[in-house]
Amino acid sequence: MKTPVELAVSGIQTLPLQHRCRGSHRVKARASYVDESLFGSPAGTRPTPPDFDPPWVEKANRTSGVGTGTSRASGANGSCETTSSSGSTPTLTPRKKNKYRLISHTPSYCDESLFGSRPEGTNWEGPWMAKGDAAKLHSLFWTPPATPRGSHSPRPRETPLRAIHPAGPSKTEPKVAADSQKLSTDGLDSPHPLRRERSHSLTHLNVPRTGRPPTSGPHTNGPRDPRPSPSGVTLQSPLVTPRARSVRISVPATPQRGGATQKPKPPWK
């Protein structure tokens, strides 16, 4: 019988051996193309690392003194290296302490107010800023969020209503937007078709049940006498579908804007 090391070198005979004996499932029995000596042999023992004095022994030597520390280290290990190391350590320790002290006193360039308010109070100034800059920075933290919300609040409400205007006469969906636009803007030409659409929407709600559209027309178009006449005529005509009503109302509104322009074709399509 071959040893598992020889089987690992051959690589071909390892497969039947893995099925025969259970001990072949280890790394040695497998055919590996890596030099396994890099990971260390399990049978051989690694060389023990050299003995070093723990940190608490060095601290005891520092407190007692350099002479006593060298005598203890030489008695424990019996080597000259420990005496030289223990004698050289006191020169390095004060440098480490000085480094830590310098780190604690170094100025930081981050805004320390994020971690909490300073006990000094209103002292926002740094060594690189002037006194006037510190006051400006303190005031800027609060002024921007308060002013734009109050001043610019009505403007975004009006802009979407103006964008809905071209689609207003052809669709019956933006009814609420047309009512709010009627109250907000009075001197523009755009409210005229919107107010007619409002009257048309009221007739839409009342016509299918009552069958008399002219009764609701005078209520909405009361302040205007000459203009409700064409809309009233178109509503009195015998129509069945609500789409036809919307078309008939939109037709007289377009010639009033432009005398010779004819725009009844897009709604019919």
Swiss-Prot record:
Family: Belongs to the RITA family.
Task of the protein: Tubulin-binding protein that acts as a negative regulator of Notch signaling pathway. Shuttles between the cytoplasm and the nucleus and mediates the nuclear export of RBPJ/RBPSUH, thereby preventing the interaction between RBPJ/RBPSUH and NICD product of Notch proteins (Notch intracellular domain), leading to down-regulate Notch-mediated transcription. May play a role in neurogenesis.
Subunit structure, interactors included: Interacts with RBPJ/RBPSUH.
Biased composition (Polar residues): 62-77
Major localization listed first in the record, in broad terms: cytoplasm
Gene Ontology CC terms, in alphabetical order: centrosome; cytoplasm; nucleus
Protein name: RBPJ-interacting and tubulin-associated protein 1
Record GO biological process: negative regulation of Notch signaling pathway; neurogenesis; Notch signaling pathway; nuclear export
Subcellular locations according to the entry: Cytoplasm; Nucleus; Cytoplasm, Cytoskeleton, Microtubule organizing center, Centrosome
Organism name: Ailuropoda melanoleuca
Gene that encodes it: RITA1
Domain of life: Eukaryota
Extent of Low complexity compositional bias: 79-93
Region feature (Interaction with tubulin): 156-269
GO terms of molecular function: tubulin binding
Organism classification: Eukaryota, Metazoa, Chordata, Craniata, Vertebrata
Alphabetically ordered keywords of this record: Cytoplasm, Cytoskeleton, Neurogenesis, Notch signaling pathway, Nucleus
A Pfam family annotated for this UniProt entry: RITA
Sequence motif: Nuclear localization signal, positions: 92-108
Region (Disordered): 37-101, 141-269
Region named Interaction with RBPJ/RBPSUH: 128-156
Motif, Nuclear export signal: chain positions: 5-17
